[in-house]
Curated annotation (Swiss-Prot):
Gene3D superfamilies: 1.20.120.1820, HscB, C-terminal domain. InterPro entries: Chaperone_TorD, DMSO/NO3_reduct_chaperone, HscB_C_sf, TorD-like_sf, TorD/DmsD_chaperones. GO terms for biological process: protein complex oligomerization; protein folding. It comes from the Bacteria. It is found in: Cytoplasm. HAMAP family: TorD. Its main location: cytoplasm. PANTHER family: CHAPERONE PROTEIN TORD (PTHR34227:SF11), CHAPERONE PROTEIN YCDY (PTHR34227). The lineage of its organism: Bacteria, Pseudomonadati, Pseudomonadota, Gammaproteobacteria, Vibrionales. This is Chaperone protein TorD. Keywords: Chaperone, Cytoplasm.
Length: 215
């Protein structure tokens, strides 16, 4: 039983790390090519076997299929990334918890400090290349992947149960507290829909994962 849980933990971490990579930086041509590979398509087909994920996975696959016919797809997708995530909160969907959870909607608010506390508590080093406040979505998802993998060091059921409680608290307090608002913003400004569909998939996966952790 414990081995099955650990194997599933590896899959969960892998999904969070994959989603983190989507929000960390623009996709290169090489990375984009991989999305059309059999391996990635099989991975997405596997995710779509879950009823809760199927609609958002299908929307993401639809965006991938449309990318094949999109002129200068890599450049256009990089422009989408820039417009959505790097410009202004007024005309995009900035990927920071502070934007959505503080009254003034400014960067480096209380959510960033809370995230710093999570990182320090677990001694996790974030990707230095990101050079972003701690409540950037890519950092938060990368951290969650690390939190999950670290729990695989446990051998006793009660320790794993405690780890599940902590992981669920992180998902609820640090992610699902603002991701639906972030998703609404992205839906408003992402005309092509690649990143919007990725965010919807992330929200669906967080909700599903939370149900698994408390189940």
């Amino acid at each position: 039983m414990m081995q099955e849980i650990k194997a599933f933990n590896e899959k969960r971490a892998e999904i969070y790390w994959w989603l983190s990579s989507l929000f960390a930086k623009e996709l290169t041509q090489e990375e984009l090519d991989k999305y059309q590979s059999m391996e990635i398509r099989a991975f997405l087909t596997g995710l779509a076997e879950n009823d809760a994920l199927r609609p958002s996975v299908n929307a993401f696959v639809d965006a991938l299929n449309r990318l094949v016919d999109r002129q200068d797809a890599q450049l256009e997708l990089a422009a989408d990334f820039c417009d959505l995530f790097l410009k202004t909160a007024k005309h995009g969907a900035l990927p920071y918890a502070s934007i959505y959870l503080t009254k003034d909607g400014l960067l480096n608010g209380e959510p960033a400090q809370k995230m710093d506390a999570w990182l320090k508590k677990h001694g996790v080093q974030v990707n230095q290349q990101l050079n972003e406040p701690a409540d950037h979505l890519a950092i938060m998802l990368d951290f969650l992947g690390n939190l999950i993998i670290r729990s695989n060091e446990f051998e006793q059921d009660r320790h794993m149960e405690e780890a599940f409680i902590e992981q669920n608290a992180f998902i609820q307090e640090m992610l699902l507290s603002w991701l639906p608002s972030f998703s609404q913003r992205a839906a408003e400004y992402d005309e092509f829909g690649f990143y919007n569909s990725a965010i919807k998939l992330l929200v669906a996966f967080c909700m599903l994962d939370s149900d698994y952790l408390v189940g």
